[in-house]
Swiss-Prot record:
It comes from Mus musculus. Residues 492-503, 525-537 have a biased composition (Gly residues). Keywords: Calcium, Cell adhesion, Cell junction, Cell membrane, Cleavage on pair of basic residues, Cytoplasm, Glycoprotein, Membrane, Metal-binding, Nucleus, Repeat, Signal, Transmembrane, Transmembrane helix. Residues 50-157, 158-269, 270-389, 386-493 form the Cadherin domain. Its main location: membrane. The chain crosses the membrane at residues 568-588. GO terms for molecular function: calcium ion binding. Expressed in epidermis. GO terms for cellular component: cytoplasm; desmosome; nucleus; plasma membrane. This is Desmoglein-1-beta. It is found in: Cell membrane; Cell junction, Desmosome; Cytoplasm; Nucleus. CDD domains: Cadherin_repeat (cd11304).
């Protein structure tokens, strides 16, 4: 548009406005008077309208009082008369009340409160102008007040989660769902314009969906949806008003999209081929399991498979049954297979789904054949009649034994006539026919009579059985004979007496009742014979009656013995003989008791065995076997009257265990020889020689016992080892269980010794004594210091009666001299030797400080007087050796005894590790003249032993130690004080010799003598000593204490002082 035309248009518009405002129209209206028929003209003049100020718009959610007055009304009538203005409507006199008010004089309308556009989009105010009488001067005026919208409401989705679904492999841009969201702000306004956007997708591999930002429609982005990969997608969609502007409000919602399955996966079999084997003539309901793999949704028609035969099953031998729950097909055999006809079958099978394939893969589907190789296994089938029925013709001219025909069974394996079967007649009406058991030739038993012909009604039907004994199988063939011709000879029912159907003839029914047994089967019939082989019986012709005067035949049984001894019976018989042959072997191996000392046998369980000394003679668990003593060599006894004692002493047999004893009276008279097995210690069968002498004998190492006393060598070894163990253990622990004596005030009282009393409570705990049995009563009395009769009179009933068998004792007179001991019993000395090497593996004791210095040793001895000596007490080796009681008896000297003794010990360097063992021994008439202790092996551990024997007169004893042992580290001191009745004097000497030097051995010798009536005693002790270290433990066991030793008392001293 050019400028000239615009000027013309603006001029015309201005002229129109002026004309419209300033022009005045005058209209005349004719008024017809109907009464007089005149017409009157009225002149109507158009006047200028009164001016009204329009109402201003109000903004919601704000205070609009600053815009008051929002409107003003005015009537032209106010120029002539007073006018009152009033308003009404919503927000004034209708809810919500009081939003608008008016000035009745001026007509100004004001707003007084905040308004909400979503509640009231606009207000209509009805305005009126009234005069003084309340009459309307003007027509009511409608004044509209619009509420301006602000963006105060976010979008709202109609659902929290939108559900949708779509098929897999769908085309791109396929609609999936449409979202719906609303905004409460003013419609068709920017505040209510919503824009949609997908902000998140799960799984988030690649975006699959798009959304229309205006309409909210969700569509597929491509055609790659695959249910087998992801069956469900989750989207989060955001809706924002103001068309998605940054200043808009937003809301979010979820979308769940399910991918529907389609048949887009071709099924296939788990295996590419199958090989199966089946026996011929066998039917299988589950020959092989064929599993189908399909990736489509399970249990749907897209997943369910159908397996079908492509080729190879032309004879319909097989069927495939599908399991819809597992998608597994079962191949079944429904018709038997014949190995002779087909040895192998090649089946070709295919698979497809119940549902049709999807259009996306229908062009890709190709039928794939899976081969199933069936191997038919040959079995021994036996025989069968082919054909199963034969018909022959017999006329009246055929005599007995006439050949009717041949009915032979065919071997299914070879297709030829069977040669290993036998034939028998099954159902044989009138007993008419006979069959050869080998050839199967059928002949007439007798000539057919008229009566038989009439009963058979001109036709014979019977059965032939083919029996294979090796396979236990039977087949049946049917024989049909047509009786033709005339001239049947009359007869008295010949041959029918033994017929299978000629049993008890019923005159009422004109039938036959009887039983027939052929082979292993029994056939019972009524009015005919029915064979178990499948043959048919023929009843008599109805209406044909038998003569009433004919005698009734008795029931009959035709039985053929077919009993044979099978392989199972032979096997059971052989097994029975084997079991019977095994019984003597079991009786030999069964240990029902053994000879005494023979090893095997039942051992009696000792009573109250808790706390007993076990068979291995030490406390604690059973020790490992030592290589030191593996065998016991028992020397043969010398013949004649040789010195038995000397021979035994020099034999060099060392053992700590005994299993027998032999009692021998060497003074003349009788010899009592016995052999008693001691199972309690479990050693070899060497007897213990226990001697009781009435005279004076010389013996070096043989232990003495009275009436078969204790195994003293074993007891000494046991208690010595226990003493050493206690001493070693005591050296490694604090001295909280010893009486601490300090003679010098202020000396030897370390501050640390005060705290040892904290352990007294545990040491004084004697609650364990409540659980000890009666066997420990003697030990408890000893611990309490009670007076105990240590030497009771010998029991006249000893030895006790043993429940085990013993060798009989023999009594025979003795001549001069000593007879030899039977060599088969053997002899065993009682000398013990235990070697304990002091190597680096031995635990070293901690040294005990000597506060009094070296060489200051004092020994105090005290003696008490007593009456005459009491006999000694001996404890015999119990066979179980479970309870051992050791007693101690202290016997003092007689009044007037003068005891003298002297002990000289040079300075002992590191001589603090000293063990003093005291043994108190009571003498008897059976003491040997001398006691000899064998030299122990080289060791670094020594024992101090003190032996006191009751003196009767003066005793002089001295002990001297050579200066060479001044630097000895471990010293053994042995003192023996002996006495006897009527002694004139006692002299004892002790010598201690040693060689100074590293690794040398020291020697300690003590010799004690006693003179009395008929008693001479001498003793020597030789102990090896090694000065290798001062820290070695005491580990050497020293033999020879005393045969009557009752108890060993072990005391540990840090300093030993000796004085007279």
């Amino acid at each position: 548009m050019d400028w000239h035309s615009f000027r013309i248009a603006a001029l015309l518009l201005t002229s129109l406005v002026v004309l419209e405002v300033n022009s005045e129209f005058q209209i005349q209206v004719r008024d017809h008077n109907a009464k007089n028929g005149t017409i009157k003209w009225h002149s109507i003049r158009r006047q200028k309208r009164e001016w009204i100020k329009f109402a201003a718009a109000c903004r919601e959610g704000e205070d609009n009082s600053k815009r008051n007055p929002i409107a003003k009304i005015h009537s032209d009538c106010a120029a002539n008369q007073p006018v009152t203005y009033r308003i009404s409507g919503v927000g004034i006199d209708q809810p919500p009340y009081g939003i608008f008010i008016i000035n009745q004089k001026t007509g100004e309308i004001n707003i007084t409160s905040i308004v909400d556009r979503e509640v009231t989009p606009f207000f209509i105010i009805y305005c009126r102008a009234l005069n003084a009488q309340g009459q309307d001067l003007e027509n009511p005026l409608e004044l509209r007040v619009r509420v301006m919208d602000i963006n105060d409401n976010p979008p709202v989705f109609s659902m929290t989660t939108f559900l949708g679904q779509i098929e897999e492999n769908s085309n791109a841009n396929t609609l999936v769902m449409k979202l719906n969201a609303t905004d409460a702000d003013e419609p068709n306004n920017l505040n209510s314009m919503i824009a949609f956007k997908i902000i998140r997708q799960e799984p988030s591999d690649s975006p699959m969906f798009i959304i229309n930002r205006k309409t909210g429609e969700i569509r597929t982005m491509n055609n790659f949806l695959d249910r087998e990969q992801y069956s469900q997608y989750s989207l989060v969609v955001r809706g924002s008003d103001r068309d998605g502007g940054a200043d808009g409000m937003s809301a979010e919602s979820e979308c769940s999209i399910t991918i529907l399955d389609v048949n887009d996966n071709i099924p296939y079999l788990e295996q590419s081929s199958y090989d199966i084997e089946i026996e011929e003539n066998a039917l299988h309901s589950q020959l092989v399991q064929i599993r189908v793999i399909d990736l489509d949704e399970e249990f749907s028609d897209n997943w369910k498979a159908i397996i079908f035969f492509i080729s190879g099953n032309e004879g319909n031998w097989f069927e495939i049954e599908m399991n819809e729950r597992t998608n597994v097909g079962t191949l079944k055999v429904v018709k038997p297979l014949d190995y002779e006809a087909m040895k192998n079958l090649q089946l070709s099978i295919g698979v497809r789904n119940v549902a049709e394939f999807h259009q996306s893969i229908i062009s890709q589907y190709r039928l794939t054949a899976t081969m199933v190789t069936v191997t038919v296994l040959n079995v021994i089938e036996g025989s069968v009649f082919r054909p199963g029925s034969k018909t022959f013709v017999v006329d009246s001219r055929m005599e007995a034994n006439h050949r009717v025909g041949e009915f032979v069974a065919t071997d299914l394996d070879t297709g030829r006539a069977s040669t290993n079967v036998r034939y028998e007649m099954g159902n044989n009406p009138e007993n008419l026919l006979v069959v050869d058991s080998r050839t199967g030739i059928i002949t007439l038993r007798n000539r057919v009579t008229m009566e038989q012909y009439q009963r058979l009604n001109g036709e014979y039907k019977g059965t032939v059985l083919s029996i294979d004994d090796s396979l236990q199988r039977t087949c049946t063939g049917t024989i049909v004979i047509e009786l033709s011709g005339t001239g049947w000879v009359p007869g008295s029912d010949g041959g029918g007496s033994s017929s299978g159907s000629g049993g008890n003839r019923d005159p009422v029914t004109n039938g036959y009742q009887g039983t027939s047994t052929v082979g292993p089967q029994r056939v019972t019939g009524s009015g005919g014979v029915t064979s178990s082989g499948g043959g048919s019986g023929v009843n008599n012709t109805p209406g044909r009656q038998n003569p009433l005067d004919e005698p009734e035949p008795e029931p009959f049984d035709i039985t053929e013995d077919n009993v044979h001894f099978g392989p199972a019976g032979i096997g059971l018989l052989i097994m029975g003989f084997l079991v019977l042959g095994l019984v003597p072997f079991l009786l030999i191996c069964c240990d029902c008791g053994g000879a005494p000392g023979g090893g095997a046998g039942f051992e009696p369980v000792p009573e109250c065995s808790d706390g007993a000394i076990h068979t291995w003679a030490i406390e604690g668990p059973q020790p490992e076997p030592h290589d030191g003593i593996t065998t016991i060599c028992v020397p043969q006894m010398p013949p004649g009257n040789a010195n038995v004692i000397e021979y035994i002493d020099n034999s060099g047999v060392y053992t700590n265990e005994y299993c027998g004893r032999e009692m021998q009276d060497l003074g003349g008279g009788e010899r009592t020889t016995g052999f008693e097995l001691m199972d309690g210690v479990k050693t070899s069968a060497a007897p213990e020689i226990c001697q009781e002498y009435s005279g004076t004998l010389r013996r070096n190492s043989m232990r003495e016992c009275r009436d078969g006393g204790l195994n003293m060598n074993f007891m000494e070894s046991y208690f010595c080892q226990k003493a050493y163990a206690y001493a070693d253990e005591d050296e490694g622990r604090p001295s909280n269980d010893c009486l601490l004596i300090y003679d010098i005030e202020g000396v030897g009282s370390p501050a640390g010794s005060v705290g040892c009393c904290s352990f007294i409570g545990e040491d004084l705990d004697e609650s364990f004594l409540d659980t000890l049995g009666p066997k420990f009563k003697k030990l408890a009395d000893i611990s309490l210091g009670k007076e105990i009769d240590s030497y009771p009179d010998p029991d006249s009933s000893w030895p006790p009666q043993s429940t085990e068998p013993m060798c009989p004792q023999s009594t025979e007179p003795l001549g001069s001299g000593y007879p030899p001991i039977s060599p088969h019993f053997g002899t065993t000395t009682v000398i013990s030797e235990n070697a304990y090497p002091s190597g680096p593996g031995v635990q070293h004791p901690l040294p005990i400080p000597d506060p009094l210095g070296y060489g200051n040793v004092t020994v105090r001895e005290s003696y008490a007087t007593s009456g005459t000596l009491k006999p000694s007490v001996h404890f015999h080796d119990n066979q179980q050796a479970s309870n051992v009681v050791v007693t101690e008896r202290v016997v003092g000297p007689v009044p007037g005894a003068d005891l003298h003794g002297m002990l000289e010990i040079p300075d002992l360097r590191d001589g603090t590790n000293v063990i003093v063992t005291e043994r108190v021994i009571a003498p008897g008439s059976s003491l040997p003249t001398s006691l000899t202790i064998p030299n122990p092996r080289e060791t670094s551990n020594v024992v101090v032993t003190e032996r006191v024997i009751q003196p009767t007169s003066g005793m002089i004893g001295n002990l001297s130690m050579t200066p060479e042992l001044s630097s000895a580290q471990n010293v053994i001191v042995t003192e023996r004080v002996v006495s006897g009745a009527g002694m004139s004097g006692i002299a004892g000497t002790a010598g201690l010799g040693g060689v100074g030097g590293i690794g040398s051995s020291g020697l300690v010798s003590t010799t004690m003598g006693a003179a009395g009536t008929g008693l001479n005693m001498g003793g020597t002790a030789t102990i090896g000593h090694m000065r290798s270290s001062s820290d070695h433990h005491f580990s050497q066991t020293i033999g020879s204490a005393s045969p009557n030793m009752a108890r060993s008392r072990i005391t540990k001293y840090s300093t030993v002082q000796y004085s007279k």
